Amino acid sequence: MVSYLTTEMKAGELRSRRSAMLLLSQESCVTLKRRGDLKEERDRGYIHIYTGTGKGKTTAAIGLAIRALGAGKRVLFAQFMKTADFSEHRLLKTLDGLDLLTFGKPFFIASEDHREGAAQIDAQPVFFFAKGEPPSFYREWVKDGLREVEERLQGYALIVLDEILVALSFGLTTEEEIVALLQKTKVGQDILLTGRNASSGLIALADVVTEMVERKHYYRQGVRARVGIDE
């Protein structure tokens, strides 16, 4: 009796396994049928956003650019709101397949006390302006940068607009201008936007959104930016 029950139980287990195998087989067939569609989706190109208060947005963008280069793809890396004094420029401008553009100097600061005009801070040129009223020449720099990127879109698999979201949050460009550029990209082109304060409209439009969150940073203890680590 015990032997009979054991045999029946084993037979039941076998039937269950066969049913599971049949189901997996059917799912595999569906997967194979869809593989072509998935490949088309994979290769169509996507909009990425790296945002948030945490460190690492530009660093991650550089990593993505290097990965693209390693796969034999061409990269257009456009930096807004930055000068060419950052350490990574020494390497990026030497990489075959990557074109580096820099738009954005001198630095500027939104002043709460209505202080305006040019100044020097740590031997760097700085332009103060009233909060909510960014200098018109800086708007033109950003607009010229977006125009140059648009003119050079052809032939790149990855386009990086580094710190363009900061430019947007300062009122140096508009969401409409950025969307107009996104609409000019072709099938197979990925475009990455970086910077703090990503707008809700661009987040809704993007396919991949990554937010860097600062939990702790030594600059809050008075440690200044370190060459080779922070700049």
Task: Give the positions of each predicted feature.
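Extreme N-terminal basic, low-complexity initiation segments
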Residues: 2-9
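Low-acidity, Ser/Thr- and Arg-rich intrinsically disordered low-complexity segments
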Residues: 3, 16-19
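Extreme N-terminal, non-catalytic leader segments
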Residues: 23-46
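Short, charged beta->alpha transition segments
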Residues: 35-36, 145-155
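Conserved P-loop
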Residues: 46-150
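Glycine-rich phosphate-binding loops of nucleotide-dependent enzymes
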Residues: 160
